[in-house]
From Swiss-Prot:
Species of provenance: Bacillus velezensis (strain DSM 23117 / BGSC 10A6 / LMG 26770 / FZB42) (Bacillus amyloliquefaciens subsp. plantarum)
Signal peptide: none
Function summary: Participates in both the initiation and recycling phases of transcription. In the presence of the delta subunit, RNAP displays an increased specificity of transcription, a decreased affinity for nucleic acids, and an increased efficiency of RNA synthesis because of enhanced recycling.
Gene giving rise to this polypeptide: rpoE
Family: Belongs to the RpoE family.
Protein name: Probable DNA-directed RNA polymerase subunit delta
One GO BP annotation of this record: DNA-templated transcription
Location of region: Disordered: 110-175
Keyword vocabulary terms for this entry: DNA-directed RNA polymerase, Nucleotidyltransferase, Transcription, Transferase
Any one GO molecular-function label of the UniProt entry: DNA-directed RNA polymerase activity
Disulphide-bridged cysteine pairs: none
Record text on subunit structure and interactions: RNAP is composed of a core of 2 alpha, a beta and a beta' subunits. The core is associated with a delta subunit and one of several sigma factors.
Length: 175
């Protein structure tokens, strides 16, 4: 049945997805989403504002319904028009190469002769471990304890000052 054979009342009772399917079947070619909306508006005899509340749901339904396929540039069509092998070619947007201005790159040549080659057999791991152990032994835990004590004393002084200020404020309120 052609879309034009439906009465205005029948069209208003149909789901927008069903109307879209009828439009695609009649046109037999992909249609941009905006043109599809415009044709639906004219068929239903409503304004875009009146249809506005239903447009989001309609777009969601188009995406979910397996009969439709989104092609490039907001163009939609019926999936049945495209054999499986052709789908990848039609649906993938063409990638435009961006032209970039060539940047001048100054490369500093590294003189590899400056670096000394080290043979792994020449490295004495025992000596390195001894150095690490010596550094660990020279670390003094008492230094940390003294720093902690100093911080605690400062915090205690601040608390005492705050308590004094609070007591002074209470006395002022009583007077």
């Amino acid at each position: 049945m052609s879309i034009k054979q439906y009465s205005q009342e029948q069209l208003k009772q149909m789901a927008l997805v069903e109307i879209a399917h009828e439009i695609f079947s009649e046109h037999k070619k992909p249609v941009p989403f905006q043109e599809l909306l415009n044709e639906m508006i004219s068929l239903l005899g409503v304004t875009k504002e009146e249809l506005g509340d239903r447009i989001a749901q309609f777009y969601t339904d188009l995406n979910i319904d397996g009969r439709f396929i989104a092609l490039s540039d907001q163009t939609w069509g019926l999936r049945s028009w495209y054999p499986y092998d052709q789908l990848d070619e039609e649906t993938q947007p063409t990638v435009k190469a961006k032209k970039k201005k060539a940047k001048k790159v100054v490369e500093e040549d590294l003189d590899l002769d400056e670096f000394e080659e080290v043979d792994e057999d020449d490295i004495d791991l025992d000596e390195i471990e001894e150095d690490i152990d010596l550094e660990a032994d020279s670390f003094d835990d008492e230094d940390i304890d003294e720093e902690d004590d100093d911080e605690l004393e400062i915090e205690d002084e601040m608390i005492e000052e705050d308590e004094e200020d609070y007591d002074d404020e209470e006395e002022d309120r009583k007077d």
